[in-house]
């Protein structure tokens, strides 16, 4: 019996923030390119050096990220023309998502020899644990305590 995979689940059908986020960052190469941009990688050759990715696939992902408004490109060399890829405001707003994924990976996907990556807050120099908190009461958010409703 042939089993067909669904392209999405009902919660992700239609126009939803989850579906849009998965379309932007759900591909492993795209997610890696965005993550590297948060680590100040800007040039095609730098992305290619860090990722075991074919150049045509990298070029496609960068083009897609520009089209989606996550990156913009800026020339840094004229002959031949070469570009740096910078996060837009929309792209920078993905940082909490990537920070959460990094922390989850440190906790659940490590080698058992401690966190593979420690985060430091530059202005104060202390270790950092990113948290998602309610902007009204300051409590840390727990999924079972969050409900959804259609925006009015």
Question: For the regions a protein language model found, what residue spans apply to each?
Answer:
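Basic, amphipathic "hinge/linker" alpha-helix immediately C-terminal to the N-terminal HTH DNA-binding motif
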Residues: 26, 77-98
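C-terminal regulatory/oligomerization modules of transcriptional regulators
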Residues: 1-2, 106-152
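Short histidine
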Residues: 3, 12, 30, 34, ...
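Short aromatic/hydrophobic contact patches that present stacked aromatics
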Residues: 50, 84-86, 118-120
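Alpha-helical linker/hinge and terminal dimerization helices associated
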Residues: 31, 68, 97-108
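Canonical helix-turn-helix DNA-binding module
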Residues: 44, 48-76, 80
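N-terminal leader segment of winged-helix/HTH proteins
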Residues: 1-25
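N-terminal helix-turn-helix DNA-binding core of bacterial DNA-binding proteins
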Residues: 16-57, 129
């Amino acid at each position: 019996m042939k089993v067909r995979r669904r392209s999405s689940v009902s919660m992700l059908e239609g126009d939803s923030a989850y579906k849009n986020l998965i379309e932007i960052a759900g591909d492993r190469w795209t997610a890696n390119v965005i993550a590297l941009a948060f680590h100040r990688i800007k040039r095609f050759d730098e992305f290619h050096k860090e990722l075991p990715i074919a150049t045509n696939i990298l070029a496609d992902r960068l083009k897609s990220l520009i089209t989606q408004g996550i990156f913009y490109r800026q020339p840094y060399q004229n002959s031949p023309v070469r570009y740096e890829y910078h996060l837009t405001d929309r792209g920078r707003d993905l940082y909490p998502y990537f920070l959460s994924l990094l922390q989850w990976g440190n906790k659940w996907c490590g080698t058992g020899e401690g966190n593979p990556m420690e985060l430091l807050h530059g202005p104060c120099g202390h270790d950092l644990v990113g948290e998602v908190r309610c902007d009204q009461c300051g409590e840390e958010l727990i999924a079972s305590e969050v409900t959804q409703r259609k925006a009015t």
